């Protein structure tokens, strides 16, 4: 099995490559990155099964050439609102199986529709194999399976506990932070009252989490909100929520959004501020409460044995100290 790891020496890609390398059936991993020297240097940490190379994914001819020589492409190249859809299209055209960690709802919608492309029947494409989406979907699914009838499905996480990677090939603005900026401005798509709706992100939602009680979280644009009703159209509501336990964090994020929408700062400047803010948070930062929502969770409301109940599923253990790459 030969694998092309796009963005393979980036903050997320490094963890994917290390994990794939441990599988004996993997014959070759091509670590492809716009930063060729970083890809080659990272690949040198492994044996000859891993090779680093430079690749500009916006060069479609070069991308097709590389994909046509492998069995699987693993896409960890962000921001996904810019790159996910065209890369999957190329995978379909070259008959190459596709996996990604796409965390934007807009391309997720478009990529799900590609299932209707007759050419796609020859490949397997799995979207959102990260922490969120990915792990959150599994946690929410476990919660759903505890119910006889499911009405609401929420995925959620603590945005203030996500720490960026120390090692990455990326220079300039952090792609994950650009993603975050895009999903907190304007409007995002959610599923409410059995239909898709565009709503204002960061709107406060109350969630009565089992054994914890009523807590506040905020709507954040993400694939889970649109992918659950795609697969389970019988549900009434699907949201992705984020919370920030550090005192004043959500207020700070809303203020940054205001500056963007007043055109006082650019999206790239906002992304740089968010990157600095996440790196500045420490375990000593004052918390809002000693009892908070889990760092990552899946939540469902519905009916069990004729009674209205809520189910929450999280990871056994604290994941607050994990970086985004480790969690992914």
What are these regions (language model features)?
Residues 35-37:
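Helix N-cap at the beta1-alpha1 junction of Rossmann-like dinucleotide-binding domains, i.e.
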